């Protein structure tokens, strides 16, 4: 039976309904500061916590609930005679429900506030109370999530109490919340690239129908702090996103964000199948489509500019899973919404992820994201690339970053004519890309050529210029072939493996 509740919340959503329900069941309500004022102004009978503790708030509100008269009432085990005797001797009343949500550190840490101002949003009293209540969940109901209010109200109505399974679950939510909250604070204060303990603060964004395959369960979690493309996008149309959709959308969006020019990326199974730049969105799309008009079917198309009606009409002609762009003209959106299952995603945030993580069995690999395209670019052959060839070479390197290694991209006039990736040796990747391209001007490679065979193969297809990191002990073999065949070659000094 709940006889006494302590309520202290930053987020006032639903709190009046809960408080009035408790009041209707003769539950004594204790409250603090702004919550006390809010409840009292709305006609709820409430006791100021100072009346309980006999001690006023101090240190600008930093100390309100940190008092034995509060924590003794929360932590006392009701079945423990010694506990109950002690709190009775000390004049402490048991507290049967604790309703607390925390200062919004997750949000405030990203606002334009000073360091000291952000520190003030690190909650101390709230976490202390809810941890105490969660530890004593057999006797105390603890609520930290506004979405749980209704369920608890209904359970009390039906059973006159909250059952032990619910109490345990609510207690578990406390420690789940606190681990994320503390992780965000520790990352804020440490500012270390690779701290001793890796603490991640992510919140469930949605449950997914399934994972990569139908027999795998899945959910999507997003960072509690920061603004990221795959956290802050807006779905304007279509079915719910799947596990594969989100992974593919991430790579497609990162690819188009590489370009200052108008760009389009068509992607399938986490690999670009068509990438192009153009003077207009329509031109970029047409060129990307022509890269591989077969593989684009059932894929994702991303743009780094607003989509217009003409482009939307062309997109609507084929089956696509997703179209993602910074924005859509109203008439373009109207066209795309006619395809009710097509997911239309508005994504305005640029790709800013500073770290990549990969899970292995029993561990997590963490690395800096591959955000550097070139380092010490130098022409290593007798012949130098033309201005247009150099533009295409840079374009190719931007694309090849997002193709599974070993990766080769063949480019002509700002268009990835052939993409070869995921091969266990470089010559196979080169043959795949060159064969797909049919014709092309330049070739980009994500890593060095171990032998001269890639340059030989490129020459057979009329390639005029090559860009690659360099660094092989047999670089001279490739340079010699290029000089003999009249091909220019540029070394970048930066490898772009992708596994």
Swiss-Prot record:
Annotated MGS-like domain residues: 1-144
SUPFAM superfamilies linked to this entry: Cytidine deaminase-like, Methylglyoxal synthase-like
Organism superkingdom: Bacteria
NCBIfam families noted in UniProt: PRK00881.1 (NF002049), purH (TIGR00355)
HAMAP family: PurH
Family: Belongs to the PurH family.
Name of the protein this chain belongs to: Bifunctional purine biosynthesis protein PurH
Source species: Clostridium botulinum (strain Hall / ATCC 3502 / NCTC 13319 / Type A)
Gene: purH
């Amino acid at each position: 039976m709940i006889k006494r509740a302590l309520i202290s919340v930053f987020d006032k959503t639903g709190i009046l309904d809960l408080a009035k329900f408790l009041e209707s069941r003769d539950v004594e309500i204790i409250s603090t500061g702004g919550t006390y004022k809010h409840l009292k102004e709305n006609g709820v009978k409430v006791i100021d916590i100072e009346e309980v503790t006999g001690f006023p708030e101090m240190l600008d509100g930093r100390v309100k609930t940190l008092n034995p008269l509060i924590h003794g009432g929360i932590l006392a085990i009701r079945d423990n005679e010694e506990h109950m005797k002690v709190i009775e001797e000390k004049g402490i009343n048991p507290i049967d429900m604790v309703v607390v949500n925390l200062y919004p550190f997750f949000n405030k840490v990203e606002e334009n506030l000073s360091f000291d101002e952000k520190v003030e949003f690190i909650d101390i009293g709230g976490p202390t109370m809810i941890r105490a209540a969660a530890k004593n969940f057999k006797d105390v109901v603890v609520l930290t999530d506004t979405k749980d209010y209704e369920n608890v109200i209904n359970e009390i109505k039906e059973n006159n109490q909250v059952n032990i399974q619910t109490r345990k679950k609510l207690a578990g939510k406390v420690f789940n919340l606190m681990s994320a909250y503390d992780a965000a604070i520790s990352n804020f204060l440490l500012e270390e690239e690779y701290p001793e303990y890796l603490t991640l603060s992510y919140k469930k964004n949605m449950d997914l129908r399934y994972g990569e395959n139908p027999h795998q369960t899945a959910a999507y979690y997003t960072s509690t702090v920061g603004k990221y493309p795959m956290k802050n996008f807006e779905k304007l149309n279509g079915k719910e996103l799947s596990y594969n959709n989100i992974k593919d959308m991430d790579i497609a969006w990162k690819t188009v964000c590489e370009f200052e020019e108008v760009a389009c990326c068509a992607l399938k199974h986490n690999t670009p199948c068509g990438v192009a730049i153009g003077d207009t969105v329509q031109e970029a799309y047409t060129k990307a489509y022509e890269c591989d008009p077969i593989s684009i079917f059932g894929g994702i198309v991303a743009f780094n500019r607003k989509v217009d009606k003409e482009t939307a009409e062309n997109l609507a002609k084929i089956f696509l899973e997703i179209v993602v762009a910074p924005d859509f003209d109203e008439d373009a959106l109207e066209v795309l919404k006619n395809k009710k299952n097509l997911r239309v995603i508005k994504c305005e945030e640029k790709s800013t992820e500073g770290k990549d993580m990969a899970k292995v069995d029993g561990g997590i690999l963490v690395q800096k994201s591959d955000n550097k395209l070139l380092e010490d670019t130098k022409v290593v052959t007798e012949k130098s690339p033309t201005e247009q060839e150099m533009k295409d070479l840079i374009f190719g390197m931007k694309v090849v970053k997002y193709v599974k290694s070993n990766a080769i991209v063949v480019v002509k006039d700002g268009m990835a004519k052939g993409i070869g990736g995921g091969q266990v040796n470089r010559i196979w990747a080169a043959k795949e890309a060159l064969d797909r391209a049919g014709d092309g001007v330049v070739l980009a490679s994500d890593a060095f050529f171990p032998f001269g065979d890639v340059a030989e193969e490129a020459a057979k297809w009329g390639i005029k210029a090559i860009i690659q990191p360099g660094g092989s002990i047999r670089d001279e073999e490739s340079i010699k072939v290029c000089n003999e065949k009249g091909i220019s070659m540029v070394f970048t000094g930066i490898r772009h493996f992708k596994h």
